[in-house]
Amino acid sequence: MSEFRYAVNVLPKPGILDPQGRAVELSLPHLNVTSVSRVRVGRRAELTVTADSEAEARQVVEGLAKELLSNPLIEAYAIELLEATSSTDSTKATLA
């Protein structure tokens, strides 16, 4: 068995109202920041999954992202593999 550490990033889908992103965008001029636009605010979850393979671990994370961590009607998610650790030889590979 190996451990796989993932990040799931969730953002409002394009065209969906993003009041937090809008509030940040409206605050930028008060900070003299003029080079930033189209701000989107979301959330990030990090999970460690123990599985026989990366494909099996990703399937678990995909299910959680779709069913628990996001609302597929109004949010999009992206899954990123951060780290993989093999329990057989304690090899650690950081991917980020």
Residue map of PLM features:
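Long, contiguous binding/interaction regions
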Residues: 1-96
